[in-house]
Amino acid sequence: MDWTDTHCRAFHRVLAPSALLYTEMVHANAVIHGDRSKLLAMDPSEHPVALQLGGSDPNLLAQASRISAELGFDEINLNCGCPSDRVQAGRFGACLMREPALVAECVAAMKQAVGSSARPDVPVTVKCRLGVDDDDDFEQFLGFIDSVAEAGCGTFVVHARNAWLKGLSPKENREVPPLTRIASCGRSDFSR
């Protein structure tokens, strides 16, 4: 948190001229009601850059997605991977992996809002984990992917480890659970 602001992304752009850069996760309410000039600051040199959104209300996520697309972001990414206590308390982040129907509803609303914006081709993507806590049922992961893909998500950014919602800090969640090797070739084409 508090790292990938516009200054950090400008530096990353120098290091990686073609990489897709991501913002910090910003809650949909903050996009709608907050100080956009501060929260969504972006220099043209940063492109391509994806806005990472947090939330679980399809209507709020739709409004935030439309605003973000029209502000020039190259991708809108729904974060379903953050394990922090604060994020869980707000019912967004990794805990949403337990609610694939809600995530699908959110993605459908986001895609519809972006599709009717001034920039209808901006993709809506999802960041997720392989599972939550000790749920390591790969079929459950595939069910999540299928459900959300059917709602229109064509790209998933998979953090290849489970998110532990109790007992580990977000930093530990990036280090402690073992990484799982998967190959991604397209919708529902995942293998161990």
What is each of the regions a protein language model found here?
Residues M1-R192:
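Flavin-dependent oxidoreductase catalytic cores
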